[in-house]
Amino acid sequence: DFAFGHSNYDQNGLIHTKAGYLRFGKKNKPFNVEAGLEMASQFGSDHYTYTSEGYIKTANAHNLKSFWHAFIGGGSDAMDGATQNNEGNMLGSWVIRLNYDTPKATYGLYADHFFEDHSAMFQLDYNGYAYEDGAMKKKENKFLLYPLKDIMLGADIHLKEFKWINDAVIEYVYTKFQSGPVYTDRTPQIPDHIGGVDNYYNNALAPGWHHWGQALGNPLYLSPIYNTNGELSFLSNRFVAWHIGLSGHPTEKLHYRLRASWQESLGTYDSPYCSPKRNTSLG
């Protein structure tokens, strides 16, 4: 009903998630570093594409090889055609955190670099393809380097002896770049492959990272349930935001938590807002 029967959608899909972390530091020392990689994939779904003549069903692979591709990456989807990509809708984050512990307080600095494909995962993309015999083939040893812009940076503190404020956090989130505003595969007319328009939380072959219209992950991405046009996609994924939070327990029976977020959104590369939209949330 929400989509008015006019939006693409998936059924019978699966989700795979994985994460791995390393910790550097000694137990009896106040300083340590934690670093890791988180990845997730939507795969194996039946995709329904809306057309003027009704829905067209495309069945993506749902077998043992699909599970393997979801685990290590690779493969392709039924609708990829000549320009093949990884099977499923994959994304992830590089995460690092610095911790410093003292008798009176613990301090933390952390960063989260999110990605939707190789262009943002490694800030590097292969640029030596050639379109030959109806398919893209690797022909040259060329690479395209992307600047690191999209990131979440945060700092927190835990005060062990001050009851009025036990914990404080501040975070900065930037998602406007998305590997740039251009995506094009190499053709005889266009000599470079540019892997921009990462379009966070959206996917050309899947409705994106949501469940019943609610975003799976960062709540600053405007969930599809709030769309007024019936589309099951994220219409605002390019933004800059700040978040702060405080908590404490002045007495044994009084505990509090205060949070505030400010966000400026630009929409998406495909459908930018005419002017930035700003939002302030308090809780």
Regions of interest found by a model, annotated:
Residues F177-Y273:
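C-terminal structural cap/anchor segments
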